[in-house]
């Protein structure tokens, strides 16, 4: 692999993670620093809803799991009831404490993405996805609103589950796979959108492993099926089968528009200067144009073609780019089918995939550039060597 002269892998592992953390903090500060300062003592309206519900309804640890959350139809005990109950008991609902927890998890998730990317790219190139993930303007609500801990924790457990699953391939112990399964359970109890994780692992196996028909690949689909049964028979009745209030539109036009908008809002250039925290009008308008949708259709078609013929993907970086875009498509799907809920915060986990995609593409481009330059220099040296020899020696 081509790498800069300074070799990060020579540093002690703890120091590497310190360096990555510093870079991610710098990226977060560059993107949201002034907004974080201005918002430090602010309680957003939905935060207040959770505070009041917790005070009125949740009086013990048991209540956290047997009572529904503030919003009907959803079961997220770890990130709604339990989270607010524990923090309220320990820190008396100080809004600054909640803001600090959000910031810690934003950085933690980026560092965790680094750990995953390192398995594919090595310690130097893996920094690119991590810093990109920490510095997206689109996650402004995730950074500023404490109620978005739901997204932060489910993203944490989802990335952790993928990372442990990837590492279980080279481990003689069953612990990585067991912990990956446990992390998947935790992700599901943080936010239902984690249900798509098994599809993500299957794509990983298709691209990076020789075979995906093995017991390892049955664990997470089995958990997903068990969770669906549990949700329908036990958890939904906690809300008396009340609807979530979400509308769904499965039309190709709606899904394609939502996908395109979530893809475009990965770019800070499209969002700056950031004024609308939900979804800037210019991004929504661009996603609604035929040429933007056509371009995204081309990307999806290319992705499908590369997944069908992975043998043509010769380098690890290219395969990671394909995996990253598939990650975006899979993890954004639960939100792409929403009607009238085009929110940038729904892009959060999908942007981790796009960050991996960018990292893989950059590594591949640099690899090709240096490989070609090396061949050119070798050829030039050979010609020069021949030209310097005396005629009788040629």
Could you say what each language-model-derived stretch is?
Residues 2-394:
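Polytopic membrane enzymes that build or remodel cell-surface glycoconjugates and lipids
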């Amino acid at each position: 692999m081509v790498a800069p002269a300074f070799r990060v892998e020579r540093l002690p592992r703890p120091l590497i993670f310190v360096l990555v953390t510093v870079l991610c903090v710098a990226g977060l500060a560059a993107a949201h620093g002034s907004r974080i300062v201005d918002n430090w003592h602010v309680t957003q309206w939905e935060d207040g809803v959770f505070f009041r519900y917790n005070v009125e309804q949740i009086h013990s640890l048991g209540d956290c799991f047997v009572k529904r959350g503030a919003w009907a139809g959803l079961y997220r005990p770890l990130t709604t009831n339990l989270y607010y109950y524990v923090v309220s008991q320990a820190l008396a609902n100080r809004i600054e404490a909640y803001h600090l927890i959000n910031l810690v998890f934003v950085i933690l998730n980026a560092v965790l993405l680094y750990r995953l990317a390192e398995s594919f790219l090595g310690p130097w190139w893996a920094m690119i996805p991590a810093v990109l993930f920490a510095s997206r303007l689109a996650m402004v609500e995730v950074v500023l609103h404490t109620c978005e801990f739901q997204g932060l924790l489910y993203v944490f457990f989802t990335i952790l589950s993928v990372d442990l699953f990837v590492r279980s391939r080279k481990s003689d112990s069953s612990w990585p796979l067991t912990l990956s399964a446990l992390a998947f359970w935790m992700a599901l109890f943080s936010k239902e959108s984690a249900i798509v994780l098994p599809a993500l692992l299957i794509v990983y196996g298709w691209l990076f492993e020789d075979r995906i028909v093995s017991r390892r690949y049955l664990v997470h689909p089995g958990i997903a099926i068990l969770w669906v049964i549990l949700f329908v028979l036990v958890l939904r009745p906690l809300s008396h089968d009340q609807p979530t209030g979400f509308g769904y539109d499965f039309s190709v036009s709606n899904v394609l528009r939502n996908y395109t908008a979530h893809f475009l809002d990965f770019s800070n250039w499209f969002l700056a200067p950031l004024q609308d925290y939900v979804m800037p009008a210019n991004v929504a308008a661009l996603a609604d144009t035929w040429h933007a949708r056509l371009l995204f259709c081309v990307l999806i078609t290319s992705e499908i073609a590369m997944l069908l013929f992975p043998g043509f993907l010769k380098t690890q970086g290219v395969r990671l780019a394909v995996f990253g875009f598939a990650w975006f498509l899979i993890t954004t799907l639960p939100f792409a089918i929403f009607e009238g809920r085009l929110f940038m915060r729904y892009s959060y986990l999908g942007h981790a995939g796009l960050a991996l995609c960018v990292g893989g593409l950059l590594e591949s481009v640099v690899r090709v550039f240096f490989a070609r330059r090396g061949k050119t220099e070798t050829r030039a040296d050979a010609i020069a060597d021949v030209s310097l020899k005396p005629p009788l020696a040629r």
